[in-house]
Swiss-Prot record:
Keywords: Methylation, Ribonucleoprotein, Ribosomal protein, RNA-binding, rRNA-binding, tRNA-binding. The lineage of its organism: Bacteria, Pseudomonadati, Pseudomonadota, Alphaproteobacteria, Rickettsiales. The gene is rpsL. Part of the 30S ribosomal subunit. Contacts proteins S8 and S17. May interact with IF1 in the 30S initiation complex. The keyword tRNA-binding applies. It comes from Anaplasma phagocytophilum (strain HZ). GO terms for cellular component: small ribosomal subunit. GO terms for molecular function: rRNA binding; structural constituent of ribosome; tRNA binding. This is Small ribosomal subunit protein uS12. InterPro entries: NA-bd_OB-fold (IPR012340), Ribosomal_uS12 (IPR006032), Ribosomal_uS12_bac (IPR005679). Disulfide bonds: none annotated.
Length: 124
């Protein structure tokens, strides 16, 4: 434990937390272009075919893996998408989500609940 004199000479440093979504460069969302759309399997003990896309961020050039939420999608290579932060716990390396219903991404067909999260208009 430091003395008060030591703290006067050299104050405590505030701990700096690491950025969880560095590719967004402190923006809430960024536009990106799909490079590859594919499925991948989650870590143990889960089992599924999770839909993901490798995307190149516009005006920045870095490539990241983004998760495609919801059932079914219309994405293919060269689709323009909007990505946001938010990792997928059982997919290592996936730290971004694609925003449904924005740019080239269609909303989830037949969605009735939690519509705002999946880009579905009311009554459709």
């Amino acid at each position: 434990m430091p003395t008060i004199n030591q703290l006067v000479r050299r104050p405590r440093k505030p701990s700096v937390s690491a950025n969880k979504a560095p590719a967004l460069q402190h923006n809430p969302q960024k536009r990106a272009v799909c490079v590859k759309v594919y499925t991948t399997t989650p870590k143990k003990p889960n089992s599924a075919l999770r839909k993901v896309a490798r995307v190149r961020i516009a005006g920045y050039g870095s490539e990241v893996i983004a998760y495609i939420p919801g059932e079914g999608h219309n994405l293919q290579e060269h689709s323009v998408v909007l990505i946001r932060g938010g990792r997928v716990k059982d997919l290592p390396g996936v730290r971004y989500h694609i925003v449904r219903g924005a740019l080239d991404t269609k909303g989830v067909q037949g969605r009735k609940k939690a519509r705002s999260k999946y880009g579905v208009k009311r009554g459709s």
